[in-house]
Amino acid sequence: MIKRIATLYICSLACACSQPDKLFRLLEAEQTGVQFANTVSEGDSLNILNYVYYYNGGGVALADLNGDGLDDIFFTGNETSCRLYLNEGSLHFRDVTREAGLETRDWCTGVTVTDVNSDGRPDLYVCTAGYPDPERRKNKLFVQQELRDGIPVFSDEATARGVADSSYSTQAAFFDFDKDGDQDLYVMNHANQRESVNTPATKKTHGEGASNDHFYVNDGNGRFTEQSFRLGINTEGYGLGLAIGDVNDDGWEDVYVSNDFIYNDLLWINDHGKGFVNLIDSFMNHQSYNGMGCDLADINNDSRLDLIVVDMLPETAEGRKKMIGDLTWSKAELIEQAGYAPQYMRNTLQLAAYGRNPGETTFCEIGQMAGIAATDWSWGPLLADFDNDGWKDLFISNGYYRDIGDKDFIDYTNNLFMFRSREETDRQMIPEIRKQKARRLPNRIFRNKGDLSFDPVSYQWGITQPSCSNGTAYSDLDNDGDLDLVVNNLNETSFIYENLANKNLNNNYLKIKNNNNISISRVRVHAGGHTQEVVAHRERGFMSAVSDVIHFGLGEFARADSVEITLANGKVQKLYQVASGQTIQVNPAEAKTPVRLEKEAIQTWFSAVKAITGLEYVHHDDPFSDFQYQPLLPHRLTGQGPVLATGDLDGDGLDDCFAGGGKAQPGIIYLQKPEGGFVSRPLEVKAPEGKCTDACIFDANGDGLGDLYLTFGGNEWP
């Protein structure tokens, strides 16, 4: 017995020793010097009852603000001030918020980085929301004035430059939409209302919505003019995710907005600098219902931008039963009748594909197939190569400070509204909300397997700490060749994850860096038979901005066959046989205007036939609600359209056709004519009650003629 125990002990030690090291290591605040915690007090004057996004948290931006070659950390705070931490090397940071002039007293949300005056020094644009007073909701543009003892000093010039937007703003993005050489500004907004956010009301598409986003055109001198309506930005939404990229590969950058609640997402296709058109229904068949953060990146190395949008579907059956709201068939019909596209409460991963014609793009949604559809109450998705193997992995921040999505709590609050006034209800609900436990969840990370699927590797890679995490961003903070992570948590000290890929793995990397105010649009790296592409925009995930140093993992390959750096002005710098393990500086003098080849139409196996003489059949199915009578059905059994069968019914050697009718609709035979086209003949037998559910043409009696076999049934009644 003792020998057996000893053997088991030795085996367990051997197994423990053989376990690979974690990819990420969570650093202690004492080690990094970063003590920031985005705290909210849940007071009587401002809380979830009078601000719908009270628990949505803040963002983080990573950028080299003082030009020392190390990315610094800027956190946004809600009821606490934003904080700036300068990177002192070796993953240690120093709080210089006061010296930098970045202390805030407003409810700050998203943050992005730009160089608004083209002086080569990064500036910060910070969105605000929360407070009912519009004066406290003016967005901030912190323009860098000087370096003082190595500390960047900023001044808020939002009002002077015309971008002090006083809406409820979540995030913003700078990009040159019209290719005139300066950065324009998209500001993503939401409204603040508790009721009716999931009611299928008539869409507001003429700029009249309180939650309409805003677009500011750069006048060329660093000042901006709001021109949303003129440019077609006219549809309401509750924007939580914002991504910029050339979605349809026409050379012009587009805008994707993921919207919360019933509001459909928006895909603003750039009309060659003249404005924008929302074409999401033409590109995607369905979307996430509660669209949170989003990211645009190429997940399968085909040089096409794919899209991830996260939602709040729990992983477990227990979690889903506690959280998922009721969506009745009648409400689903109302939503469809009001013009809303199909939406589902889960993460969606939209895989880009070429359309049939040149310039066309379509998306196939593969979230469930890829294994990333359910990650619970999620916020910020980031697609990046964290293990340097040449494939972009997926990190998702998770958690919500009060579990107000619990169905029992929702039923309780609904009952309160039935019997009390709004004021009485609010007084009673505030203490009840404070009693609700925090939905502290581990953040999730998935390894890209390279076959359109992802492995959940949170435990294996060391991402296991439960938290209420919101904004997150990546950067190589210690310049060792792998991407570290910074996470802004609610009512908890922020996370800094050190990436250990350079120490624990043998994969190579390559980095590309902007040269002062030269703006990169995208970079393509060809290595080992694969082509990777990264869009250079910093706004990713949720309320956050990543480093402007573009990172590629090369796996086992010690060099890249070629590197193509496309600048914002359209010129391309090409490099060949580039050694790994280095950071390339952009050299605009080497960039040349590319010859843009016209895309050839894809040769398809089939072509559409616009009309065939004699085939004018119109199927009719009476509306019927299956779920009203059978609520546990997995899908409708009615409304499935006509049955079709082909075969030679008249012995002339040509295939004829039979189309089965709906309930009380007779089927029709179409006989093919030698000269082309068809002639219709009614079915000369009395059909039984019900709908024709199947049909087959075959020689039943061996006389050489096609016979018609029909089945009847249906789910409609009476």
Protein language model annotation of sequence segments:
Residues 70-77, 121-128, 185-189, 250, ...:
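Hydrophobic beta-strand segments that make up the repeating blades of beta-propeller
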Residues 127-135, 188-208, 314-340, 400-437, ...:
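Short, conserved, GDST-rich strand-edge loop motifs in beta-rich repeat architectures
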Residues 17-23, 28-32, 42-48, 431-449, ...:
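Gly/Ser/Thr/Pro-enriched helix-cap/hinge segments flanking short amphipathic alpha-helices
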Residues 24-25, 81-96, 135-156, 194-227, ...:
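Beta-propeller blade repeat segments, especially FG-GAP/WD-type strand-to-loop junctions
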Residues 36-59, 78, 100-113, 160-173, ...:
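Repeat-based blade/solenoid architectures
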Residues 57-67, 86, 108-121, 140, ...:
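Beta-propeller blade termini
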Residues 1-22:
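Bacterial Sec-dependent N-terminal signal peptides
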Residues 98-116, 121, 126-174, 192-206, ...:
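Asp-box/WD-like beta-propeller blade repeats and closely related beta-sheet repeat scaffolds
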